[in-house]
Amino acid sequence: MQREEKQMDMLLEAVLNRLNDLKHSIGAMIHRLETEYETINWPTFLDNFALISGHLTGLSKILSSEIGTPLRNLTVLPLLLTPERDEALLQLTEGRIPIFSHDLVPDYLRTKPDPGAESRMAAHEAKANNLQPDTAAKQVAQYNKVISHVWDIVSKAREEWDTEASSRPGIQQTSSLADTQALVAAVGVGNGLTMPVGPGGVPNAGIMIPPAIRQASPMSAVSPGAGPLGKMPSGIKTNIKSANQVHPYR
């Protein structure tokens, strides 16, 4: 009897250790997804998932081993039920179970599905067992036909994409490096821009125009009454009369 109790303690300790490792791995993965969702890469995610899968596999091996009495042959019975808050139970369960009352015991110690879920599951199983073999075979054949058709469509689309990608010479360039460098030089250091000359031969430091506009309106073609240098010449002709003429309607 003492040997079986010792084996049971060893089994429970191994299960608890594996459960703690599994809990820490899941918590670390959730924390990483919440805090590093912008920088986490796929290999790191797969490594964390593989670690969780390894803990689950180890837990399954421990539970399936024949060390001592199998846990499935044991029954868990509550020794104390109270509707009041139990601080020791809250600390033992890490804040998950504050009360161990008559209403909560069936949910916490349940080893079978809920009665409603169990009845629905039994109804589905009975419906599946009453299905005729010919009808089941026809449904399976139709299902396989649909899957094959979808597989053919996906395979054809993949072949077309691969062919198009292999025949494509490369990404077409949509910008000019020389124009970009010239624009950056003009904006940054004023390369290619000239400073216009204002009235009296004084340079106008507030306006800088490109050479093309400056050549289109040379100083020799500007009349004395025209505006400042740098404006495009107007195509409207005006007739300015002298101020000493008498207005006809006065």
UniProtKB/Swiss-Prot annotation:
<dbReference type="GO" id="GO:0016592">
    <property type="term" value="C:mediator complex"/>
</dbReference>
<comment type="subunit">
    <text>Component of the Mediator complex.</text>
</comment>
<feature type="region of interest" description="Disordered">
    <location>
        <begin position="217"/>
        <end position="250"/>
    </location>
</feature>
<dbReference type="GO" id="GO:0000978">
    <property type="term" value="F:RNA polymerase II cis-regulatory region sequence-specific DNA binding"/>
</dbReference>
<feature type="compositionally biased region" description="Polar residues">
    <location>
        <begin position="236"/>
        <end position="250"/>
    </location>
</feature>
<keyword id="KW-0805">Transcription regulation</keyword>
<dbReference type="GO" id="GO:0070847">
    <property type="term" value="C:core mediator complex"/>
</dbReference>
<dbReference type="GO" id="GO:0003712">
    <property type="term" value="F:transcription coregulator activity"/>
</dbReference>
<keyword id="KW-0010">Activator</keyword>
<keyword id="KW-0539">Nucleus</keyword>
<comment type="function">
    <text>Component of the Mediator complex, a coactivator involved in the regulated transcription of nearly all RNA polymerase II-dependent genes. Mediator functions as a bridge to convey information from gene-specific regulatory proteins to the basal RNA polymerase II transcription machinery. Mediator is recruited to promoters by direct interactions with regulatory proteins and serves as a scaffold for the assembly of a functional preinitiation complex with RNA polymerase II and the general transcription factors.</text>
</comment>
<keyword id="KW-0804">Transcription</keyword>
<protein>
    <recommendedName>
        <fullName>Mediator of RNA polymerase II transcription subunit 8</fullName>
    </recommendedName>
</protein>
<dbReference type="Pfam" id="PF10232">
    <property type="entry name" value="Med8"/>
</dbReference>
<dbReference type="InterPro" id="IPR019364">
    <property type="entry name" value="Mediatior_Med8_fun/met"/>
</dbReference>
<dbReference type="GO" id="GO:0006357">
    <property type="term" value="P:regulation of transcription by RNA polymerase II"/>
</dbReference>
<comment type="similarity">
    <text>Belongs to the Mediator complex subunit 8 family.</text>
</comment>
